[in-house]
């Protein structure tokens, strides 16, 4: 794996600038600035070298106030000595700052050391660290930026500092306990900070342990809370580290304290959300337990209750499954339920014996319908089986059941066939002059067909029955072998007028094409000459009959 190019300038050999002299190659070791290996995820700290390694006026380096970041290149390990001597000779540099010849072995702590490309052996720049305030150590846990480092000898001690804000990397207890102390002067401020940090971390860890013992804590499946617990545990292990205790500063403690507060708030919010979820689950379970099926809410009456209700019932009523039921029937059916009608039928069948009760099957019995003079919505198509009451809990033989089923289906089919050829009842009479003329001038006996609804048990006619008018919308004919479709719907024209009815597509109005309806008059009367033989009705007017638009104004507009 090739090391990434993170150097501050290109790898090519730069040209010598006029008026600029190259200094001798030097190895710069900063005591406090961290060195981050690009191929590793841990941070390494260089220990201070003995003073004999530094020559010249730069020999005395104050490590406490050294707040500069040194950017340099890796020297070539193969020809370190020769290259340094040649550089001094070629550049004609004053030997005030001689190069330090440090034998660096090939067995370095870093991987891929020999794959790093060679670069000019000179000190590039010494600039202040923009991320740190003055007179503060460079070591910051929350703000570590990768910087380049030089390979050093194997006998130089390195310390690995655990990164507390990375939850994925585990921290071994052996590395923490085996840290070698660094020779540095500790003051009382660092001791106080160390005690405060340990106190805060212990408080947060105890807070997390309190929630671990609680029932509201999540299991190992909840990754968010589990990772927060691990992060707090790593904070406590970091506080016990010897190197962390000796290298922490005031600003670092404030950042650590803020981070602990953030983790504590996050843990509290996660646990609160978990508590709310469990409360919702408990509430849903309680609602499910309280809500029972519909059959459990309605208690079915017992046999004794049925007997008592049968003996105390009033006059019997029955269901009428006609399409147009009377108001009294609707009121009685809504006031009493189906169970009431079944009880009423049981009482009538048991109290009044009939000759057909023994021969007819028990599951389907006909109740004689009583004539009501106020019923104005009776229909001819009412069959003798319109009023049927089914007795529950009766078992019949399969042969009887099939016969009853076939009888019911045959009655329904015949009723549909009878209604197919009959025209619809006119609910809204049109405003055409033709239809109004024939309604007013035609014979009432021929134009108006009065139909009555006879009772099931008597042959007397009801004079208050509804009269249905059947006529052609075009010619007013009331008798025709077949009713045909017209502009006002199905079965609105007689057979003669419907034969001349046709649809054409013709341009009308602002639209490019509209469907126009055209039909021809079959009867031409002397008193109705103003209407031509052909009348064109736009389709949009026909479909808007339910709106406020009247057809008289539209006809006048078309005919003029």
UniProtKB/Swiss-Prot annotation:
One GO biological-process annotation of the entry reads: regulation of transcription by RNA polymerase II
Composition skew (Basic and acidic residues), residue ranges = 369-378
Give the residue ranges for region: Disordered: 274-297, 345-383, 412-461
Q: Does the keyword Plastid apply?
A: no
Presence of the UniProt keyword Acetylation in the record: no
Query: Which residue intervals are annotated with compositional bias (Low complexity) in the record?
Result: 347-361
Composition bias of kind Polar residues appears in: 428-456
The record places its GATA-type zinc fingers at 472-497
Task: Output the SMART domains linked to this UniProt entry.
Answer: ZnF_GATA
Compositional bias of type Basic residues: which residue ranges?
414-425
Select a single GO molecular function from the record's annotations and give it: transcription cis-regulatory region binding
Keywords attached to this Swiss-Prot or TrEMBL record, sorted alphabetically, are: DNA-binding, Metal-binding, Zinc, Zinc-finger
Gene Ontology, cellular component aspect:
nucleus
Q: PANTHER family attached here?
A: GATA TRANSCRIPTION FACTOR (PTHR45658), PROTEIN GAT2 (PTHR45658:SF18)
Protein known as: Protein GAT2
Source organism (scientific name): Saccharomyces cerevisiae (strain ATCC 204508 / S288c) (Baker's yeast)
